[in-house]
Amino acid sequence: MKKKFATVIKMAVCSLLAVAVPALAQGEAFRITTCAVGAGPDSVAVADVNGDGRLDLISANNLADTLTVLTNNGAGGFGSNATLIVGSGPYAVVAVDINGDGKPDLICANNLANTLTVLTNNGNGGFGPNATLNVGSYPVFVVAADVNGDGKPDLISANNGASTLTVLTNNGSGGFGSNATLTVGSGPYAVVAADVNGDGKRDLISANYYANTLTVLTNNGSGGFGFNATLAVGSGPLAVVATDVNGDGRLDLICANYGTNTLTVLTNNGSGRFGSNVTLTVSGLPHAMVVADINGDGKMDLISANFSVYPNAGTLTVLTNNGTGGFGSNSVVNVGLQPFSLAAADLNGDGTVDLISANHGDNTLTVLMQTGGSLPRLSIANTGLKTFRISWLLPATGFVLETNANMSGTNWGAAGYLITTNGTTAGVNVTSSVNHLFFRLAK
């Protein structure tokens, strides 16, 4: 399924109130493709697994005990699916070259087996042999980072059932040893490795779902960690990322709070301490998050994947960065059912950032490719009691005005209003007494 969307606006009828909601990525066009994968995809990774210079997709299929590899055909499509058997309950996957041969290997966290599976890349997109690494109870996340300064990527798992992180150091040939166990807050669901205190060493930050906190563990430079700091955030944090949101050269922290439908932004004071918390509201139940310059202005924007309530489609919320640590232009696009994970990468080599969600509820990946051009934007104005004019700039060749009562992914239909033109604009006149209507241009 492929479709382009322009602005989505919300018409709220309450006395003479009309509210316009900006388009995704300030009007940037996306081509949306749905890719079938294994049952219950809970994570997606991006890497060139077959060495053809194109970024491929890898999903961790929690209910199938498999990974699915979809190779990029170079034109924005994906095929040549391969299925890889891993441990029980793969919940997260990461792609990184662990043995120094220049090829991205795959590592997944198996939450029912309390293990990591390591699959080495043979150079043409095939993988083997598998290695199994024991970690803590119920690992739900894995990240690769050089934590001891030897130039080799180590592995860190977030063990939700044990409230710990497991650190496995890389011996340089693809093997791992010297496991360390680090205690964090209750129910860690994600971990990020980032230098938050400016000493050149990768620190660890976990998002602790049951504790409603982040734990910051500073790196001593030899692979050990100390000075635990606890940061209060919203209810049920499921994801955490590190990026410089205000342009001061320091890595700030952002977490997605599933229980409060919010993101928390914590600014870095330069010594690894955090303050000036800002709360950003997103649409229902944020489950994952990435940072990426989605609109090409050189500033890192925030994108959350929102689980939503079944049977409503999941959504992505995009919040654009104003460059001083603030975020605006909150905008929404529909994806598949129950998006668990999110990735951002330039999949078609056009210089713009594309988005990929792993949708647990319908066994798919949703791929949103930026087309590189702006779409016509809708605007709304009151013209009388319970009457509105919805308009857009011409030309808008090939676009159809659609409406929906609830922003679901399945109930959009042709609006059916008479379109009239006035010089450089086209539009429709709407009379309605319902509380909310949503409109979009679709192609």
Regions found by a protein language model. Name each.
Residues 373-443:
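Short, composition-biased motifs enriched in small/polar/acidic residues
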Residues 340-374:
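Blade-level signature of beta-propeller repeat domains, shared across WD40, Kelch, NHL, RCC1
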Residues 22-39, 71-88, 120-137, 169-186, ...:
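Blade-edge motifs of beta-propeller repeat domains
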Residues 57-60, 106-109, 155-158, 204-207, ...:
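Hydrophobic beta-strand segments that make up the repeating blades of beta-propeller
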Residues 63-65, 112-114, 161-163, 210-212, ...:
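Short glycine/acidic-enriched loop and turn motifs that connect beta-strands
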Residues 42-49, 91-98, 140-147, 189-196, ...:
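Beta-propeller blade termini
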Residues 53-55, 79, 102-104, 151-153, ...:
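Glycine-aliphatic tripeptides that mark coil-to-beta-strand junctions in extracellular
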Residues 10-22:
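Bacterial N-terminal signal peptides
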